[in-house]
């Protein structure tokens, strides 16, 4: 087991799909899921070459053989540089991620990893197309004997400074940052996110790199198009998010509240279920929602980002159903997917039954 794999940091007894590890080159190519390259057979390598399956998304974490073996608990993990040379020789590309575990692969080890990876960012078809640096995510369900510690504010600021120094160097050499920090670093460090231009064409958006800045950009563009001066009848709504985005989303709430007759309150929650002080929205569970909202004045309803729910079903990560949460809170809940749906729901309040109908059509 990889000690920092989120799948291995879950409680037992939940739905089967939560424990599925998709270390599969086909899923990596099709959906952008990350694989380690440690489990591929010779036939699979041949298939990748023959069918030119590229780009792949690869969890690197470290390029020093012993350190990567220690991190991935796999004796073949030390071959990563050989694998990259193999891909480079065939003009096949990857997007890389490095999950930083304090006191293990940070500091000089992180610098070594990033410089090694960037050495493959050369030529017309660079083997390493982009790199994401991500903080390790820990839950209270992980084994207590592991060697992992959470990322502190001080550590986040240290990594930001280290990576930004390298980015400056790479911009001069390549005309691109090449590597990017996941949004969580800035949230943990409590510093401002980089501007929109920093993320170029968002090559690592699926890894949480620039997703907040992109959401803010899309919100402002859509709000300009859709928000009226006033609405009737007036309504008051609660918008639930993970507390990781609380500061970044305050200007969006102010913009919504400029509409006469519309009042939106942002409620930012952490997850006691996972045992996290800082939580991204997608990891909030039914238990977290109930604990955070019970006893509050929820007005005319709750705006709930649908990424908290299983795709195609109104079920949270802890297997509590949305209907259960509605029944206990005794208030309408409006699952919203994306910026446009969020704003339109504020203006029209599509009922939960419409959401269930939509689920049934998928």
What are these regions (language model features)?
Residues 120-125, 132, 138-362:
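Auxiliary Fe-S-binding modules of radical SAM enzymes
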Residues 55-57, 93-97, 130-132, 178-180, ...:
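Structural preference for beta-strand elements that scaffold enzyme active sites
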Residues 1-124, 137-166:
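Conserved Radical SAM active-site core
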């Amino acid at each position: 087991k990889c000690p920092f794999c989120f799948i291995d940091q879950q409680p037992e007894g939940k739905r089967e799909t939560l424990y599925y590890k998709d270390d599969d080159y086909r899923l990596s190519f099709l959906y952008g899921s990350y694989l380690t390259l440690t489990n591929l057979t010779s036939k699979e390598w041949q298939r990748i070459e023959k069918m030119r399956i590229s780009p792949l998304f690869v969890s690197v974490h470290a390029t020093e053989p012993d350190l990567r073996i220690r991190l991935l608990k796999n004796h073949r993990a030390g071959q990563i540089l050989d694998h990259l040379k193999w891909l480079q020789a065939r003009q096949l590309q990857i997007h890389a991620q490095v999950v930083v575990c304090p006191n293990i692969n940070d500091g000089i080890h992180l610098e070594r990893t990033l410089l090694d990876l960037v050495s493959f960012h050369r030529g017309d078809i660079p083997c390493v197309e982009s790199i994401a640096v991500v903080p390790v995510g820990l839950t209270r369900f992980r084994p207590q004997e592991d060697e992992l510690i959470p990322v502190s504010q001080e550590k986040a600021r240290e990594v930001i400074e280290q990576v930004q120094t390298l980015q400056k160097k790479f911009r001069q050499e390549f005309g691109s940052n090449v590597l990017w920090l996941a949004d969580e670093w800035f949230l943990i460090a409590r510093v401002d996110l980089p501007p929109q231009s920093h993320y170029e064409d968002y090559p690592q958006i699926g890894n949480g790199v620039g997703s907040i800045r992109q959401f803010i950009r899309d919100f402002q563009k859509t709000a300009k198009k859709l928000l009226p001066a006033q609405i009737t009848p007036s309504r008051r709504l609660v918008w639930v998010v993970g507390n990781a985005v609380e500061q970044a989303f305050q200007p969006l709430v102010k913009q919504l509240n400029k509409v006469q007759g519309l009042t939106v309150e942002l409620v930012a929650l952490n997850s006691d279920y996972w045992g996290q002080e800082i939580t991204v929205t997608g990891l909030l569970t039914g238990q977290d929602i109930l604990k955070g909202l019970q006893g509050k004045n929820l007005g005319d309803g709750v705006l709930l980002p649908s990424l908290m729910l299983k795709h195609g079903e109104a079920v949270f990560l802890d297997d509590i159903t949305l209907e259960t949460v509605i029944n206990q809170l005794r208030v309408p809940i409006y699952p919203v997917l994306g910026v446009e749906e969020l704003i339109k729901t504020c203006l029209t309040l599509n009922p939960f039954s419409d959401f269930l109908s939509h689920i049934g059509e998928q």
